UniProtKB/Swiss-Prot annotation:
The lineage of its organism: Bacteria, Pseudomonadati, Pseudomonadota, Gammaproteobacteria, Alteromonadales. It comes from the Bacteria. It catalyses: DNA(n) + a 2'-deoxyribonucleoside 5'-triphosphate = DNA(n+1) + diphosphate. NCBIfam families: polc (TIGR00594), PRK05672.1 (NF004225). Belongs to the DNA polymerase type-C family. DnaE2 subfamily. Its main location: cytoplasm. DNA polymerase involved in damage-induced mutagenesis and translesion synthesis (TLS). It is not the major replicative DNA polymerase. It comes from Idiomarina loihiensis (strain ATCC BAA-735 / DSM 15497 / L2-TR). One of its GO terms (cellular component) is cytoplasm. The gene is dnaE2. This is Error-prone DNA polymerase. GO terms for biological process: DNA repair; DNA replication. Keywords: Cytoplasm, DNA damage, DNA repair, DNA replication, DNA-directed DNA polymerase, Nucleotidyltransferase, Transferase. GO terms for molecular function: 3'-5' exonuclease activity; DNA-directed DNA polymerase activity; nucleic acid binding. It is found in: Cytoplasm.
Amino acid sequence: MAGSADISKGCSGQLFAELHSLSHYSFLRSAASPEELVRRADDLGYAAIAITDECSVAGIVKAYQESKARDIKLVVGSEFRVPEVGTLVVLAPTREAYAELCKKITLFRSRSEKGHYQANIDDFFDGFSQCLLLWQPDFSQAQLLAIGEKLKSVWQQRFWLLYERHYQADDERAFQAMVELQQAVKVKVTCAGGVCMATIEQQPLYDILNAIQHGGSLAHQPGLASNNAEHHLRSLSELQQCYPQKWLAETLVIAQQCQFCLSELRYEYPAELVPEGMSASGYLKQLTEQGARWRYPQGVPESIKALYLKELSLIKEQSYEPFFLTIHDLVRFAREQGILFQGRGSAANSVVCYCLGITAVNPAQIQVLFERFISKERNEPPDIDVDFEHERREEVIQYIYRKYGRQRAALAATVITYRFKSAFRDVGKALGFSEQQLQYFRRNLDRRDKEQSWQQQLVQQHPEVTNSVRGQHLLQFTEQLMGTPRHLSQHVGGFVIAADDLSRLVPVENASMTDRTVIQWDKTDLESLGLLKVDVLALGMLTALRKMLALINLRYDQQLTMATIPQEDSRVYQQLQTADSMGIFQIESRAQMNMLPRLKPKTFYDLVIQIAIVRPGPIQGDMVHPFLRRRAGLEEVDYPSDEVKSVLERTLGVPIFQEQVIKLAMVAAGFSGGEADQLRRAMASWGQNGHLTRFEDKLINGMLERGYKQEFAERLFRQICGFGQYGFPESHSASFANLAYVSSWFKTYHPAAFYVGLLNSLPMGFYSASQLVQDAQRHGVAFLAADINASDWNYCWLPKEDTNSDETVRMGLRQIQGLSESRIKHTLMQRPEDGFTSMHELRKSGLRDSDINALARADALKSIAGHRHQAHWQSLSMSDQQMPLFENVKDRPARQLPAPDEPDNIKADYESTGLTLGRHPLALLRNNPELKNCVLASDLMTCRSGQVLTLAGLVTCRQRPGTRSGVTFLTLEDESGNSNVVVWANTARQFRQCFLTSNLLWVKGIVEIHDGVVHVIAGRLKDLSGLLSFTRLESRRFH
């Protein structure tokens, strides 16, 4: 065990334990990861290493995992920099000491905003009865003797002075001061490296990080660069030259006392949900049986009963009942509050979850693999993801805090790491480049180019920069910085709930959002230690669906729910087969739209396959085309055995889901459940470490031993490799398919309600409000402009008697940019029945100038002041009437201004609302010579395959799948609809600038028609964005 490794382990007779080292979880203060520090310490022959990040234990779990692999002792601690005192390093020798440390870190963090802490010397005179303290004094300060004596009186034998030597100019003075302080206080001295680097080679990156931290540049502030690299882990011989032997030996004494290991942590889940007099297992069984009767009102099938009894037995054996009861309590609360939710992921493999109402997919609809959810051999906590409406998830989060208290519940952390854009920017600034220069360099870089790295592109485009030393450093350090932690953020919804004070287990700190707290460990850390978390996630489509249901139920006096929407409706599938899926959850991407006419879903299970098959795994594993050929009857389905047939029959002999791969390994190659799960994990990390190769022999030999042919065994392994980290679980796909079907049903039968629900739930999903409104118009939905006297805050589905149409929608004021929601809603509450009649009356409602100006620019004051120019003029002329003296002054006589023309109106529409209800901008440009002979999107179906043509449109979507090297799918929008353009790597590279940045793109290419799907293969590209000078349109870069 790493926590109790043999302390006598040494190298060349010299023994040393590093007691003060920072990892890159002391954000921007270290160039080394925890793993690198542990590995290097072991290589150097250290007896132990302490990871002592600043007011944090964020790196210790990763260090612990590495220390177990290396069999080097890990000491847990933390560093605190205290003004006018120096640096205090606190070490945890025992489990109780570790709890003390975590509680103190929590206290210090609670005093400050996210990312900071406050600690003073008085904090170290109380509350530490078990920890060890190393004090590195700031010898520039006074009163050190008094502080030292007070620390000794409190900490007694648990207190040392800490000396670190880094070959600075004042080393001798500091050494003498340390000796004098030791003699005065009569306390022992130990030594450490103050480590911020694993190796000397990390010094240049360390200097870059230091410049970033201080917001300066090494070019203009040379003092930000370190004098040497002595903050790295030094060899034992180097350390022997630095420090007295007695001080070195003291490091071992201290390390010997530190016997705490993270394996000692025990996590207890809340148990208060169990009624008095009942056991957790008995109560969970009771709830499951009640739920089974609710799910199966005609009688619970024996097969279902057998499954849930088997699951309950394993849940009891693993003591997971409180976890399931907690999830059940959360969804019960959501259901009582009318909040839509749905469990997904591996939990959909569980019949218990289905009976408890956590998941919505009937296990009879999919092939259940409970081992994918809970496995005795895996001995890891289950993962239950529950999506809630994104607008109301906060209600669930605050319910958790109310029920368990902030001492017992907090969100898991997410480590925000440097990605290319942020690394390029911060490194560039640290090297002295200006923001304008960096934007210029980065402008035409295509990070998705699989044949040319971004470095090669930069060298090619800006040789004058990259030939310089500074330019070379920009290339080098940007690459090194990518992946380095930048700060902690909150997980999207992973809650850790404890039976007792959570801060005894892990420190808790403030999140950037009010009323949120976050622990210092991320999801991976929790999994490594076997700690349970509850995933309370947000999903915009659930918000939209709840609003659609409310609209239908109110309009038609129904009690429709997601569960009572008619199933297997042929009209729904007919619409999907035509790729009419804009706005439909999970099947609205261009790739999904291209697949729909080919796969032609006719049943719910077809939809499950549809969602899973358009993924990198099936595509890379060459599973898509065989499946489509077999589905179309063009290829014979052949199974090498009945066992394989039982696994693959529903997908025509092609493994599409992750569960199928696991089952195949078990039935065809003889894998145990635990071995099959190890295979799944290797698949998940294939792109990172290639661990799949170690299963190749076992998988292939296992199949050969069972009589399968070599060709089948090798093909299956290739397919597994193709899945890589992108294999999609059937349970996950089934949960998503349920939402996809429901949203498709609304689009088919109630398009106005469908689009109103979506528009009132933005921002979410794949498409902008402009694209959704245009799609709605193509489906017969009419839109009326926003008006202060007719609109509400949200889009409204208007009564048929008001419009003589059942599909008319009034734009909501929410669509107008720059409005205050609270002030507008206050004004709407005061709106007279007949509406406002003057600008003066409107102002008295409490709106500010900015609100009235925004309404005027959006042409939403037409009923009061006329066209937008007139209304805007009146709003400006009223600015001198805000003083009390002018409170009762009537509106001035309005100067009559000319009405805007059509281009002006379109431009103002886009600037104020992001969309127009007038003609499409391309309709106004259609007679421009640049667009001469361009084919309309609606006419592409009449073209023949192989025809050369030109087309033009607004770039609304750029997609580059991670599977098909070098290909990008563009969506171009004109006044008639959308067209699909395929741009291969060579074409993208040849026309890189317009390909990456164009808003209005002209394309010359060749038509390709396959299975009713039309593409244009681009040969030439031209940027026509200049023609859009009358609008403020922006293209969408990449999804």
